[in-house]
Amino acid sequence: MKRHILSFFSLLFAVTITAQTLNVVTGNVTYAFPAAKVGDMTCTDATTLTIGGKVFAINDINKIYVDNSEVTDNEVTVIYDGSTASLTVAGNVAPYVTPAVSGAHVSIAQSNTADVDGNEITYTLSGTSSDGEFYMSGKYKCSIEINGLSLTNKTPVYSGAALHVQNGKRVNVSVKKGTENMLTDCSSPSEDLAQKAALYVKGHAEFKGKGTLNVKGQYKHAIKAGEYITVKNCSLNVTGAVSDAVNCNQYFLMESGSISMSGVGDDGIQCDIDEDADATGETTDHEDENSGNIYITDGTITGKVTATAAKGMNANGKFVASGGAVTISTSGGGEWDSDNVKTKASACISADGDINISGGTFNLTSTGAGGKGISGDGTFIITGGDITINTSGAIAYYSGGKISTTTSSQTTERLSSNYKSSPKGIKTDGAMKLSGGTLNVIASYHEAIETKGTLDITGGVIYAQSSDDAINSGGVMTISGGTVCAYSTGNDGLDANANLTIKGGTVYAIGATSPEVGIDAQERCTLTVSGGTLVAIGGLESGAVTTQTCYQLSSSSTSSGSTNGRGGFGPGQQGGSKTWTANTWYGLYSNGTLALAFKTPSSGGSALVVSTSGTTTLKTGVTAGSDTFWNGMGASSATNGTSATITTYSSGNGWR
């Protein structure tokens, strides 16, 4: 022993003379001390050796050597190589980390780092192991750098996760530029080692870097944080998960980078309010926020969610988007929720609170029974963005102790709303306000756009198509701006279960044959047209108040003699001939200037009612320009055409 100690002091002398690095090896761990930072060294009773504040049991030391390697302060490097892992610990943080290595299973307990110039420790992970893990515990901020890592945890030692940070503070997860990485957890851990995700952070996780991280959750979630998650620059690919692809509490923020999700057994991105902390709602700069909100400011999110009643993105609070590109499809059917006594269904985007979209591009597709594009329990506000939604599922309903499906509303009309889920493009319980952006919603069954509250449209380009009401509001509907096309093949174009007022904007409403109409307000409520540019196929409901003059196309202006339900020109009359020609472009003019070019559908209600704020004229057979919108049903320019005969429409000439 005396000879080993003398050898050590000889090495120490060499280090101090040549400014080299002193390396102390214990098992698979190397502690690297730069000469300038070795500090005081003591040997106690020939049993322990203290270097730079790190106490070593001499019997645990395998080797001490000197080399010319450079040491990066505050860094711990872990290299996986098959069934083994080797660690290098920078000397300045050696007193604050306690590693344990079993094969390729690595555990590190981190203690106070406040004495290390106030800096945090960075753990750099690289290499490959088909049976390994990284587990870190502590109470201080740290960074995890993933730099060419492929890790699968087959036989857990410390946790079933591939990467587990049992640390309630902020953890940076940096995926290094140009690297492709893979994390896979254990599919069947023991109960005491059962993990919450393949990549789990107890605190808040901030993902960054410009590399790619692939994650597969074989037991529960793929990625999970006990607090918030932010994503910036890096690419996260969830290739499979038994439960959610990404799960967190407090809030989720997508700033840049990309997330792709497939093969998940529940939701794509799930954000909950942390029940162990006080709920705060949204806060400035998200400081101390516990809202359950999902924020999208930039980046790309793609997801294919197939599970029953699953959500592409599900916020316990609000959903707020100001940018980015989101493409999500859901295909799962409905299920009965016995706890809440209701039928649940899938949705591409779902929020228990408000939904606010001011920018970004959204392509949402739902094909499962009862599925929706966007579903919210609060208010729904769109001021910008480009949103495309397609839903094609049937109705999911609970009867006779099981979930069934149907495409007929008559089958479920006697069931309470809790016992059925109807597929809709957008459905919200609170007020809806649309003032900007582009919204294109097509629903094969049931409403394309529906709010249980009021609907206020002041701007934006909106196209809604459905076999049910194209746009429906439970409360007052007001249109004072925007460019709106509501096209129903089986019901009303616009339908309010209260008063409905059109006082501005451009509106093209298409209703089905009798008894449906183009624009409809609730019985004993009032439809008022006081401004804007209006086209209504199927006409207006009986008793409409038209303070701006409306006109109806004369039957002599059409080449079609077929009957198509509603028509006639006397109060309450029905069953007259259709006054317009199908699949034909018309031009609506105000004071001689084109206000709107519109294409008629293949079928619809008999009457065609028009109105503008000036002297109104109509042409048939115009040639539309290339500047089409509304899914090819509207255009801003047109040429040619033949004048059509229109006659004044009065409130007495109702179509209902």
How would you name each of these model-derived features?
Residues 15-19:
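Sec/Tat signal peptide C-region and signal peptidase I cleavage site
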Residues 69-656:
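A composition-driven surface/loop motif
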Residues 4-14:
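Sec-dependent N-terminal signal peptides
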Residues 20-70:
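Compositionally biased alpha-helical segments
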